[in-house]
A protein has these predicted regions:
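ABC ATPase NBD Q-loop/coupling interface
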Residues: 14, 63-78, 179
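Conserved beta-strand
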Residues: 9, 21-31, 36, 62, ...
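Short, small-residue-biased leader/transition segments that mark boundaries at the very start
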Residues: 1-8, 94
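A short, flexible loop at the N-terminus of ABC-type nucleotide-binding domains that lies
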Residues: 2, 12-25, 75
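ABC-fold ATPase nucleotide-binding domain signature/coupling loops
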Residues: 18-21, 59, 65-67, 123-151, ...
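ABC-family ATPase nucleotide-binding domain "signature/switch" substructure
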Residues: 44, 48, 54, 81-89, ...
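ABC nucleotide-binding domain "signature motif"
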Residues: 60-70, 209-210, 218
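The feature captures the beta-strand-to-loop junction immediately N-terminal to the Walker
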Residues: 39-41
């Protein structure tokens, strides 16, 4: 529902080790069905802000809300049905591949699990393992970075959550199938409320809203056209910045 996919962040800020604020009184509303991209230099707070939506961390002050409900009041099972995430360095616990994919849908059928793996271009890799979907990560096998990415995409596909948190650098972790992963991500994002952690101008230029972050605050928000005079966006668009590092 539109209410479930209306994400609202208000005065959220987080201080690692109680020192410099990683986020400083940030307010941001994600409208249902739109794509919002966060861009900014390394350390600007974009990943901290985005991962709060998946409750990897909670704000010291302020709230993160979905449909008016504070995330801290939501059971994790409900949160996983509302928010799925595909991040640059997916943290996968020591559990079976099946358990990883079915995080939000533990009652999924075998066919649904296989279909999700197929959509994420990881099914053949799983079937090639002696234990298949029962393979325990970190014990029976160690997956490549690209395979872990595709596993997290399969999890998001199966979850079918209305909100998606996505790091657009995901595809770059596996050059051999970068185009396939991009296609899977594009299909996954369609029709959802999406929050993108952006690193390259061309990958976020079509976003409904682009927010430029600096020093834990939002410096400017708008379309690519509206940000034409914003210094960081100008440098990013000109290709002078890669992965948040000026070259």
């Amino acid at each position: 529902s539109s209410a479930a996919s209306d994400v609202y962040k208000r005065q959220s800020y987080h201080t690692p080790d109680g020192e410099v604020p990683a986020l400083n009184h940030v307010s941001l509303t994600l409208r249902p069905g739109t794509v919002t991209a966060l861009v900014g230099p390394s350390g600007s707070g974009k990943s901290t802000l985005a991962t709060m939506l998946a409750r990897f961390r909670d704000p010291d002050f302020g709230t993160v809300r979905i449909g008016g409900v504070d995330l801290r009041e939501l059971p994790s099972t409900d949160l996983y049905r509302l928010v799925s995430f595909v991040l640059q360095d997916p943290y996968l616990q020591r559990q079976s591949i099946r358990d990883v994919i079915t995080l939000a849908r533990p009652d999924a059928t075998e066919q649904q699990v296989r279909d999700a793996a197929r959509t994420a271009r990881i099914l053949d890799d799983i079937d090639a393992l002696p234990a298949g979907f029962d393979t325990v990560l970190g014990e029976d096998t160690n997956l490549s970075g690209g395979q872990k990415q595709r596993l997290s995409i399969a999890r998001a596909v199966l979850a079918d959550a209305p909100i998606l948190v996505l790091d657009e650098a995901t595809a770059a972790t596996d050059p051999d199938c970068e185009a396939e992963i991009q296609q899977a991500l594009a299909a996954l994002a369609r029709g959802r409320t999406v929050l993108v952690i952006g690193h390259h101008a061309e990958s976020v230029i079509g976003a409904d809203v682009i927010c430029v972050m600096e020093n834990g605050s939002i410096a400017a928000c708008g379309t690519a056209e509206q940000l034409a005079e914003q210094p960081y966006w100008v440098r990013l668009s000109a290709g002078r910045i890669m992965e948040g590092v000026t070259r």
